[in-house]
Amino acid sequence: MATPRGRTKKKASFDHSPDSLPLRSSGRQAKKKATETTDEDEDGGSEKKYRKCEKAGCTATCPVCFASASERCAKNGYTSRWYHLSCGEHFCNECFDHYYRSHKDGYDKYTTWKKIWTSNGKTEPSPKAFMADQQLPYWVQCTKPECRKWRQLTKEIQLTPQIAKTYRCGMKPNTAIKPETSDHCSLPEDLRVLEVSNHWWYSMLILPPLLKDSVAAPLLSAYYPDCVGMSPSCTSTNRAAATGNASPGKLEHSKAALSVHVPGMNRYFQPFYQPNECGKALCVRPDVMELDELYEFPEYSRDPTMYLALRNLILALWYTNCKEALTPQKCIPHIIVRGLVRIRCVQEVERILYFMTRKGLINTGVLSVGADQYLLPKDYHNKSVIIIGAGPAGLAAARQLHNFGIKVTVLEAKDRIGGRVWDDKSFKGVTVGRGAQIVNGCINNPVALMCEQLGISMHKFGERCDLIQEGGRITDPTIDKRMDFHFNALLDVVSEWRKDKTQLQDVPLGEKIEEIYKAFIKESGIQFSELEGQVLQFHLSNLEYACGSNLHQVSARSWDHNEFFAQFAGDHTLLTPGYSVIIEKLAEGLDIQLKSPVQCIDYSGDEVQVTTTDGTGYSAQKVLVTVPLALLQKGAIQFNPPLSEKKMKAINSLGAGIIEKIALQFPYRFWDSKVQGADFFGHVPPSASKRGLFAVFYDMDPQKKHSVLMSVIAGEAVASVRTLDDKQVLQQCMATLRELFKEQEVPDPTKYFVTRWSTDPWIQMAYSFVKTGGSGEAYDIIAEDIQGTVFFAGEATNRHFPQTVTGAYLSGVREASKIAAF
């Protein structure tokens, strides 16, 4: 059927909303119009033939061909068909033929591009895709603050980050300013630029933007580039080279792809899942929007390509340099894409970056910004917040909110910051944490991020841990492996048992393990030796250390509830300088009031009123409570109105776990000859009643120069030492060491400490656990805010990562995001 042709007087192109456009004519009407006589120009001259774009809703009344590839290019005149890429970008049928027809000069260029696209990409290598990827001109913004106009570059200029950073109106391809003529900035901006900002413009875009040479490309080499917002035509996105797969269009999921490492980037930074990978904490799918992203940016739900391109770019830029705040201005030069859509990308990157900043995905950690460099726009600055507690959770939230530009006051009951982080630097050459010091799983762990920001190195623990019996004999590794296997088998049976059990059917974990163990002995007829029984007790003591409680208080149904969520993978490390380095940096420049225990929180009025025990009053719009679970359970803070029954039930369904530590410095390293460079060694308990006493001894100096050991008291043993003074605990510890190294003389320590977390009035615990009859849901309930006014953070509010400094820190980041959004 013949294409309808319209003939009329040439008109200037100007802005239209699709809603104001006339209804489309039927084919018959269009054909009739094509035969109508032509009008004449106002000056009486002959009219110029032209054709409208046939894309419904396109505002271009007189399209102009951007390609100018064919000698017969229609330019702004008549063509038999316009090909629509966006409301301001079209190419004519003559230029289409130039590349698409095999007898034309441009055909070889098109087919070469098509082969590259097909071998790397997944989407169709259509002529429109070719034009968008290879022929559309680049747009760039003048960097003069008083100008900031968008200019279309000539075809021969390839946009680079350097050009984008330095471009001024009138700049030549060699980046030199044109000879003095007129002020190029005074020239008006192209009218099409204004259209790009309209909400409907993006919906009229035929193809989503695919970034060229994205910083994210090396991290995403195992993906089809066009599925993660990148152009398949760039060498940086050459998937075949990256995966060693030369087969066009096929994606090999090799094992090597699961551990992508980019030179110069911290090996613990792995922000993107690789194909077929799962279960890695703080990882995002580069080809899928997360639920909270869809909620924030619903306009990308149908085609998320632009969002993914910009989000992936932002994440890659952040992890390339996490020591400086990432701003829109730093991202924009790396947005390399042809066409007017680059303008839209630049506009959108600001929104996306602010969202990711608020969520704590970027611009987080110990990053500190000046008063004129707040990370969020002024709309967020009109809030005031009181934070109760200066531990990792409170300081994380305070640092985030302060960086956002929100007024924050921190009230801390103790005479120091850190909460359950407290480092002892009095040992010669070694820092020993009285609280946390070990990082379990470093990949994507925010602690690893903060260490990178501070230039701190962590010591990776080795795997070797010899189990030494009282009497000095090292346990045969085959016995250790056998009992480790049996221990894990017991826990596997517990996992099977709980699958169909409700909370009402819950039993203590210790009771269930004993029941399964006895049933196994009875059914199998296997008899374990006395030593094997003792080694099993060693593994049970480690489980009590992990839970922070004796196993007869822990839920068999929910003891490892967080394992159902992605956890931190990778190395287990010792933070040799201690967590206090991080804590002090988080606190830098914040308004922190020490010795200010809070007595009452009244949130019944328009503002929250907080009163300390000495009667001092503070008021703010929001309050964040980060005190330990034990203090909430004992009602250390009075709430008005009182906390709901649901929240109090959740608070009391968790246990306030407790462990204690002992550290000892010796005149020399007496253990070296037996331990042979291992980072720790185990103590096989002589009986079940002794199993929580000094189960593992840690060598606190990775350099093996200084002579400091640290051990832990867990389970029932915590209660047994509570009535002893420090010297008596030391005597028990030394008696154990002298049994383990019976063949040699063990010297008296020159210095030591014993922690007393259970009796610290403002702490009273180590970390939380789920009590029998409870569930992991309690963590979420405790974390719920009250009326958008009272918020809660701390390890006991983090269902995914409880019991850790990491979990506490992330809960503070989470609440800062919620507070900023209200």
UniProtKB/Swiss-Prot annotation:
Outcome (variant: residue 543 to A): Reduced demethylase activity
Q: Which residues carry this modification: Phosphoserine?
A: 13, 17, 26, 247
Annotated stretches, region: Histone H3-binding = 438-467, 487-498, 538-572
Q: Which residues participate in FAD binding?
A: 383-439, 598, 795, 803-805
Q: What is the effect of changing residue 115 to E?
A: No effect on DNA or nucleosome binding
Q: Where is the composition biased (Basic residues)?
A: 1-11
Q: Where in the cell is it found?
A: Nucleus; Chromosome
Q: Which co-factors does it depend on?
A: FAD; Zn(2+)
The similarity comment for this entry is:
Belongs to the flavin monoamine oxidase family.
Assembly description: Interacts with its cofactor GLYR1 at nucleosomes; this interaction stimulates H3K4me1 and H3K4me2 demethylation. In contrast to KDM1A, does not form a complex with RCOR1/CoREST. Possible accessory component of the polycomb repressive deubiquitinase (PR-DUB) complex, at least composed of BAP1, one of ASXL1, ASXL2 or (probably) ASXL3 and one of MBD5 or MBD6. The PR-DUB core associates with a number of accessory proteins, including FOXK1, FOXK2, KDM1B, HCFC1 and OGT; KDM1B specifically associates with ASXL2 PR-DUB complexes.
- Report what the protein is called: Lysine-specific histone demethylase 2
The organism named in the record is: Homo sapiens (Human)
